[in-house]
């Protein structure tokens, strides 16, 4: 498998992967956008990688992070907000080697840039994502509550 930067030619496949990817059991967030890259453009410094089968060209997954300067207890740190990690349900079952290589590829690139840690958000009902993150060495450090107000 090849880990490489995502390119505009990947857009259609990445949107399809996003639409099929599991999000948990109770809440499904729907984000209708015309380009998979629109979220990455919200940040000034992003890394967006895909895992590509070198024999078939099929995309096995995607990982994305934004490098950010953060102030933690009065000290400036360089962190990376991981805002996407998805496997292609048409190509993968469970935690595959492809997702491992993608995660490691992101880590390597972030360490080269001097990033001290990676952080992200996982919905509490998304047990598969929790499992993947824990297998990769992540640990839960806090909790956020989001509230919605219906408008009708």
Positions of the model-derived regions?
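Glycine-rich phosphate/pyrophosphate-binding loop shared by adenosine-nucleotide-utilizing enzymes
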Residues: 1, 56-62, 80
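Short amphipathic alpha-helix that is part of the acyltransferase structural core
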Residues: 1-37, 42-44, 81
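Preference for well-ordered, secondary-structure-rich cores of eukaryotic proteins
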Residues: 21, 51-54, 149-151
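A short helix-loop-beta-strand connector motif used in the catalytic cores of GNAT acetyltransferases and
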Residues: 36-54, 61
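Core nucleotidyl-transferase/polymerase catalytic module
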Residues: 49, 83, 141-142
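Conserved catalytic-core motifs of GNAT/GCN5-like acyltransferases
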Residues: 70, 121, 139-152
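Acyl-donor binding region in acyl/amide transferases
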Residues: 75-137
């Amino acid at each position: 498998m090849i880990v490489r930067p995502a390119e505009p030619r990947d857009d259609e496949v990445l949107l399809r992967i996003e639409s099929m990817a599991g999000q948990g059991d109770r809440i499904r967030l729907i984000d209708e956008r015309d380009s998979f890259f629109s979220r990455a453009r919200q940040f000034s410094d992003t890394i967006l990688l895909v895992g590509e089968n070198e024999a078939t060209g099929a995309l096995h997954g995607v990982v994305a992070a934004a490098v950010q300067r953060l102030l933690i207890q009065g000290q400036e740190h360089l962190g990376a907000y991981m805002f996407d990690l998805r496997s292609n349900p048409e190509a993968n079952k469970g935690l595959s080697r492809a997702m491992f290589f993608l995660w490691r590829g992101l880590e390597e690139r972030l360490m080269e840039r001097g990033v001290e840690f990676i952080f992200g958000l996982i919905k509490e009902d998304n047990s598969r994502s929790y499992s993947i993150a824990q297998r990769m060495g992540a640990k839960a450090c806090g909790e956020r509550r989001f509230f919605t107000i219906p408008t009708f």
